[in-house]
Amino acid sequence: MRKEAESVVRELVHDPILLARKSAPAGQEDVETARDLLDTLIAHRETCVGMAANMIGVFKKVVVFDCDGTYMTLFNPEIISCSGLYNTEEGCLSLLGGPRKTQRYQKIKVRYQNEKMQVRLKTFTGFPAQILQHEIDHCNGILI
């Protein structure tokens, strides 16, 4: 187990075959993976606003992202409602090439667990909603 102040930046996975694997549910044993994932996101903050655990080779449903300037960690996130479909383009740190066309929802309601594995519900809108949809897609093996 690492010390609290120790930062662990993990190598990124770029293989689309691996990234297309669905992730398994996360549990309390994945909290350290979430910390590594956040450290890795912060190390790439100039070019990345969100990451899923499969991007560092861990196939568990763990997501970290920048939500309007505050980093959030979500375990087992799932979208339970959405509205306001729109077309956009997104890039991905794990995929080579430029932005790709995709569709997202302006507003999403997400059920997830926090680090204590307590179930939470939260509504996200705008860019945070877009980021989170991208990362949840990663958990489900969906690539843009």
Regions found by a protein language model. Name each.
Residues 1-144:
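Positively charged
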